[in-house]
Regions:
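Short beta-strand elements at the ligand-binding edges of bilobed clamshell
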Residues: 29-41
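Residue-level detector of short coil/turn "hinge" positions at structural boundaries
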Residues: 10, 34, 60-61
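Hydrophobic alpha-helical segments within soluble ligand-binding/sensing domains
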Residues: 19-23, 39-56
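Structural detector of well-ordered beta-strand residues that form the stable sheet scaffold
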Residues: 13-15, 33, 71
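Hydrophobic alpha-helical
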Residues: 1-26
Length: 101
């Protein structure tokens, strides 16, 4: 919105981290080029598995990283599903601009 307020739309390329609803909508409509998204569901699954292994007395790694998802205009609809493990919401499909370049 700061870019819009400054009248700089189309003159500034934006990228971001994390895929909240507002960011997803802006990527879908072409106002943000893309970014990276944490995988909260997958992070929780990894943490639960490690906790279970630790409770069973198994050795667990001291550090575990769940890879981020790269999100672009081309994959934002699928990325939303990957990140949140839900169907792509209608509001996001409606915001998607097919002919964005």
């Amino acid at each position: 919105s700061a870019v819009r307020a400054a009248g700089m739309e189309g003159k500034v390329t934006l990228a971001c981290n994390d895929l909240g609803n507002n960011v997803a909508r802006e990527i879908a409509s072409g106002n943000i080029a893309g970014g990276g998204a944490q995988m909260p569901y997958d992070q929780g699954v990894a943490e639960a598995k490690l906790a279970a292994l630790a409770l069973l007395g198994e050795e667990t790694p001291s550090y575990v990283a769940v890879p981020a998802e790269t999100v672009t205009h081309e994959n934002v609809l699928e990325a939303y599903t990957d990140v949140y493990h839900v169907e792509t919401p209608d509001w996001l499909k409606e915001a998607y601009v097919d002919n964005f370049k």
